[in-house]
């Protein structure tokens, strides 16, 4: 039976594996029992301040201690919001303004920075919170009041207006996500994670909460090692790390610097990747270097608690159309809806779907004629992992989360991802690009990711990104690699329709990246 509170994982694991390491950083490590004790002390400290069901800011360096603080916030009946030194000051101030939090927990690395921010609440040190005597009676009372729909965290994503949006996630969202993901990754108490994602990103959930459920161990890989892939491989081998869930661009660092010519991961059993498309040329090199590992492509959105679908890669040679994003995780449903609101492909072929809201009243029907393979539509996700929306932003929540009524009697809430996809002849779901990266050029609709996928397959192109200038009507392909610009353009001419060939090709020493490792498209836009 599934728990209703995420802390049940920690409490049970601390009983089963009290002395086993849970999280290990550069300077410290915590056993499961130590982690549980820390959360009880920190939870009591916060609860003593009579703060309940409110956001608490945690501004610390990534470490086992930061995990203690996050879970301590949850133990107190509140929800956490992670701040990080990598965030620009304007973003930090925006999050502070949106949350109106009363308390911020800091450590020695962030204390001075915290004082310079526009925060009017209490700033307390991690050490002060940790020194509190656990109040068992108070914590028990809080746990009795807790509901599975209570918020556990806010993760802030970029907003189209430049103001970040806080995605709300509950205990039930995270529990159902971890229950399904753990089965896909085949986790158990012997799983050893190597964490890459910052804790302010939902991508870190795969490591943190799966560790709590299974009694696994997570190593926080030093950030500097991602600039030295051979040293990173040595780190993976030294600590016998057998499972990694990396953003795709992190995997390409190994291959573009030819790290596998010098060393190979010896213990990897699972290599999961997502966040952006992984070029097939890089996947082939990884599969050759780690022939005994399972490779899993994960797809999802922050608004759906991270990942919603998966595809296990067995034969990369057969992936002519790229890597599928596959099938839904348990307790998840995925629909494709076209521009007219019709379902293109549906796991419930006999269903009729109605969308009713204040703005519209239309009925969407599933029929055999609509099940047109490779007919593209917007990927819409439903299920228990679906967020309740954006924090204090009802307008955009209503726009992105749409309530549907199926004619079989079921009602379902769907998140409109803005991603475009299609169902292939193999029955798998394929991602082709963002709806907002779909352009109309010379009378044709073009998905920029389709051009990027083509360029990423060139031998000598490590990775690339397309930017479109609508005023000049020019597509620019920026890339890293050893292939010269003229040859890249010639390859495009040989492989793409003429209207899709980039008007400009620009070679860069290094593509600009965002904190999570994705390519920074806004930074590239400034170069055109």
Task: Map each language-model feature to its residues.
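AMP-binding/adenylate-forming domain of the ANL superfamily
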Residues: 1-154, 169, 176, 283, ...
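Gly/Ser/Thr-rich phosphate-binding loop
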Residues: 213-216, 241-245, 255-324, 330-333, ...
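ATP-dependent adenylate-forming carboxylate-activation enzymes
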Residues: 60-64, 78-94, 108-110, 216-239, ...
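AMP-dependent adenylate-forming
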Residues: 5-7, 104-117, 121-144, 174, ...
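Conserved pre-ATP/AMP-binding loop-to-beta segment of ANL
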Residues: 138-156, 163, 187-193, 199
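Conserved AMP-binding/adenylation subdomain of ANL enzymes
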Residues: 165-194, 202-242
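Conserved S/T- and glycine-rich ATP-binding loop of Class I adenylate-forming
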Residues: 56, 73, 104, 151, ...
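Conserved AMP-binding
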Residues: 60-63, 84, 187, 197-204, ...
């Amino acid at each position: 039976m599934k728990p209703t509170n995420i802390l049940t994982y920690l409490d049970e694991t601390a009983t089963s594996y009290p002395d086993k390491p849970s999280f290990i950083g550069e300077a410290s490590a915590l056993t499961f029992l130590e982690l549980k004790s820390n959360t009880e002390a920190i939870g009591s400290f916060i609860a003593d301040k009579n703060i309940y069901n409110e956001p608490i800011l945690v501004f610390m360096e990534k470490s086992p201690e930061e995990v203690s603080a996050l879970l301590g916030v949850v133990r107190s009946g509140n929800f956490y919001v992670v701040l990080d030194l990598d965030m620009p000051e304007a973003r930090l101030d925006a999050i502070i303004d949106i949350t109106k939090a009363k308390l911020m927990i800091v450590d020695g690395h962030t204390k001075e920075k915290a004082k310079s921010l526009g925060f009017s609440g209490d700033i307390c040190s991690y050490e002060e919170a940790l020194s509190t005597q656990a109040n068992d009676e108070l914590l028990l009372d809080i746990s009795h009041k807790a509901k599975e729909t209570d918020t556990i965290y806010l993760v802030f994503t970029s907003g189209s207006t430049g103001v970040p949006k806080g995605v709300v996630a509950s205990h039930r969202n995270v529990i159902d996500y971890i229950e399904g993901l753990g089965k896909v990754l085949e986790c158990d108490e012997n799983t050893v994670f190597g964490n890459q994602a910052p804790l302010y990103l939902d991508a870190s959930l795969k490591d943190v909460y799966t560790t709590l459920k299974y009694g696994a161990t997570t190593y926080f890989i030093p950030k500097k090692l991602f600039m030295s892939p051979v040293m990173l491989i040595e780190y993976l081998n030294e600590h016998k790390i057998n499972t990694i869930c990396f953003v795709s661009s992190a995997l390409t660092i190994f291959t573009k610097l030819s790290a596998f010519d010098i060393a190979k991961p010896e213990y990897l059993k699972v290599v999961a990747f997502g966040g952006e498309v992984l070029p097939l040329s890089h996947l082939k090199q990884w599969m050759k270097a780690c022939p005994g590992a399972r490779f899993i492509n994960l797809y999802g959105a922050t608004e759906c608690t991270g990942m919603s679908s998966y595809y296990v890669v067995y034969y990369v040679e057969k992936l002519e159309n790229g890597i599928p994003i596959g099938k839904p995780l348990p307790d998840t449903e995925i629909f494709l809806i076209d521009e007219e609101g019709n379902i293109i492909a549906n796991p419930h072929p006999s269903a009729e779907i109605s969308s009713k809201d204040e703005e519209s009243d239309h009925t969407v029907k599933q029929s055999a004629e609509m099940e047109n393979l490779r007919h593209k539509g917007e990927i819409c996700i439903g299920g228990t992992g679906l967020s309740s929306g954006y924090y204090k932003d009802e307008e955009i929540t209503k726009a992105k989360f749409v309530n549907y009524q199926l004619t079989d009697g079921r009602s379902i809430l769907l998140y409109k991802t803005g991603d475009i996809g299609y169902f292939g002849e193999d029955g798998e779901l394929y991602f082709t690009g963002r709806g907002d990266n779909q352009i109309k050029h010379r009378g044709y609709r073009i998905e920029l990711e389709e051009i990027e996928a083509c360029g990423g397959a060139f031998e000598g192109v490590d990775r690339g990104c397309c930017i479109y200038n609508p005023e000049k009507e020019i597509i620019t392909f920026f890339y890293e690699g050893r292939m010269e610009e003229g040859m890249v353009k010639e390859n495009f001419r040989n492989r793409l329709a003429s209207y899709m060939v980039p008007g400009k090709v620009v070679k860069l020493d290094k593509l600009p990246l965002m904190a999570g490792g994705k390519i920074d498209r806004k930074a590239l836009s400034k170069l055109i």
